[in-house]
Amino acid sequence: MSASLVGSEMCIRDRMITIRVEGDEWEPSIDRTPGVVREIGASPEEIIAKIREAGIVGMGGAGYPTPIKTAVPADKKVDCLIVNGIECEPYLTADDRLMVEKAEQIIVGAKILNKALGIQNAIIAVDENKPAAIEVLRKITRSYVGVNVQVMKTKYPQGAEKQLIEAVTGREVPSGKLPADVGCIVQNVGTVNAVYEAVQKNKPLFERVVTVSGDAAETPSNFMVRIGTPASFLISKVHGNPAEIGKIIFGGPMMGTSAVNINAPITKLSSGILLFKDDISFKPEETVCIRCGKCVEACPVGLMPFAIASQVRDGDYHEMKKLHVLDCIECGSCAYICPARIPLLDYCKLGKYELKKSK
C-alpha cells in the first residue's frame, strides 16, 4: 500500500485511512525539468523494476499490476502492444484530455513498454469521436518508428480488452485465455503515461486525471488530482450542490459504481465522478422473459444472458459454467436493452461470484 503524500496515520474508518500531511517526499526525487525525455536508457529489467517501484496498475478499470502484465511468460509470444485510448462510456473524457495534453509522453511510454516486451510494434487505438487527440497523436507519431495510430468506430463496449484486440488485429481471444495467448498486450493510455513518468522522470503513480461531470455539475471539468483526494473536494470545484445531488457514480454510467459517501477517495482506478440530480438507479418493474433474444444480440462476448439468469435462479453451477458466465465483461448491455427489465447484469455478476466461490 502506498500514499500520495508523506505524513502520519491519524485513523482508519470506513475502509479509508486519514493522514496528517507532514511534507512531500516525492518532490526531491522527481525530475521536473521541462520537455519530453525521448532517449530510453533503462534495460527491460530496469523498466519492469521501475514500474513495480512506482506502484503502477491498469488505470482503465481493472487495476491489474502492470509489472506482472509486462513480464510475459517465456512460453508466450507477444508481437503487438495496443495502447487503449478508447473511452466509450458517456460523460468520461479523462483519457481524451490526457491524449491531447500528454501525447508525446504516451508515445514514448509505448516505446518503453515495447522495449520491456522485446517487440517493435505499438498501436494507439482511439475513438473516431476524438479528433483533437487523433490529430496530435498522428502528428507526433510521424517522428517515431513502430508506433501507429488506429482510429476506431465509436461504439460500446469497444474499449473492453478482448473486444479491442479483435477490432484492432482481427485476433479472437479464446474463452478462458489471456491477450498474451494471441500475441497481444493491452495497456490504458493513463497507464502508459504513468510508465513514461516512472521510467523517464522517476515519478511514482500518486495522481491521475479524473472527469467530474453529470447534470448536477455546473462546470464539468477534468482534474489532475492526488490519489486519496475526497470526492467532495472535486464536487465543490464543479460547483455541485450536495443538496441537489441524487446519485454519485464513480466511473461511467454503464460500468461505474454508486458512491454512498460524498467523501469517498479517488483511487488509481477512478476515471470519473458523475453527479446526477435525480436518483437514476430507479428500477422499473421486472416482467417475464419473452425470449426475444435482444440480450444475446447485444452481448459483445456472445453469451446468452437470459439463460444464465435462469440458471443463477436455479443455483445450477454446472450449467452456468457451460454457458461461459465467467467470460462476462459486465458491460451491462444486456440489462440496458432487455424489454422485460430483468436485471441480467446482476444475475451474471452473481453467477460469476457463486461459481468462483464454489471452486
What are these regions (language model features)?
Residues 40, 44, 51-64, 74-106, ...:
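Conserved mixed alpha/beta catalytic, RNA-binding, or beta-rich assembly cores of soluble enzyme
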Residues 119-231, 237-242, 252:
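Hydrophobic alpha-helical positions that pack around
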Residues 270-283, 296, 300-359:
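Ferredoxin-type iron-sulfur electron-transfer modules in oxidoreductases and energy-metabolism complexes
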